[in-house]
Amino acid sequence: HLADAFGMNVVVSTRTAPKNCPYEVTDILTAAEKADFLTFHCPLTPQTKGMVNRDILSVMKPSAVLINTSRGPVVNEADLAQALNSEKIAAAYLDVLEKEPMSPDTPLKTAKNCTITPHTAWAAYETRSRLVDIVCANIRAWLGGNPQNKVN
């Protein structure tokens, strides 16, 4: 919903269509073609590992920006560096990398218009406050006999 505040047209690509989603839901390649800002918010699974690769990057607009705050291996770093250096996309902002701490060999280290933060996107006060609220709610639920987010 934050993108709405900036007047952005939001397009969603997900394995399972969310109920009552106010946004257009489409496949990942169509989303990549339409995107001015393509952001990733997914877990690392066998299906998502290397998902952002030459195929997706090749259909993006030359003015598009890629943002990854999910998991580093979702992005193929060599393909992204090539897309940035050949100006197939405009920029990338990454809070996660394939290897952390950053490998001295990553091609993203010298890629054009690539900004890398040290896995701290969660560190804003508001985010940490929300995290504490969730933990407290989970403890209250557990004490009340209704545990949440069980891992058995």
What are these regions (language model features)?
Residues 2-3, 71, 150:
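Generic low-polarity alpha-helical segments
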Residues 5, 33, 65, 92, ...:
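Intrinsic disorder/low-complexity signature
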Residues 98-152:
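C-terminal helix-to-coil terminal segments
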Residues 1-11:
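Conserved anion/nucleotide-ligand pocket segment
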Residues 9, 15-107:
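Rossmann-like adenosine-cofactor binding region
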Residues 2, 37, 79, 134, ...:
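Alpha-helical scaffold segments in soluble metabolic enzymes
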